[in-house]
C-alpha cells in the first residue's frame, strides 16, 4: 500500500488544477466556459489516470506507482463527490460528453453565501496545514517541517480574513486577485503534501 494514501491526498487536490486553465483564459481574454469542473472532474479522466499509472508500474516493475495511481483516482473521486455536495453549479462528470450532474438544480443560494465560499477555501487550506502539523507531532515524523507548516497555516488564515473582507467590499478585480492567490495556495498545498509524505503514509501503518 506504499504511496496509496499519498495518492489519495494528492488526488483530492488535483481536480482544481483546472483553475490554471481558467487563469490563462482570463489573462488572454479567452472564454472560460467549459474549463472548470469538466476535464479534471470527469470519471473518464479518473479512469485514464489509474490505467496510465498501472501501466507504468508494470513496465517499470515499481508497484508503488500503481498504488499512487489508484490513490490519485480515489482522491479525485472524493473531490468530485464533495464538489457535487457543496457547490451549486454542477460537475461535468462524464466529460467530454455534454452531461452535467447538479444535485442542487433549481436551488439558488443567497449571494452572500456564494461569496463566502471563496474565502472559506483559504480557511480549508489553513486547517489542512494545521492538521498535517498536528499529525506530524503525534507520529514523530517530518518534525523538521512542522515550523514551516505553522507559518503557512498563519498565512492562509490571514488570507482568509483578507478575502473575507474583500469579497464583500471590492467592486471589481476581486476574482483576478483571488484566482491568482488560490492557484499559489494550491501549489503550496501540493508541494507540502509531497514533502510530508512520510507523515501521510504513516497513517496507513
Predicted regions and their residues:
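N-terminal membrane-targeting hydrophobic helices
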Residues: 1-205
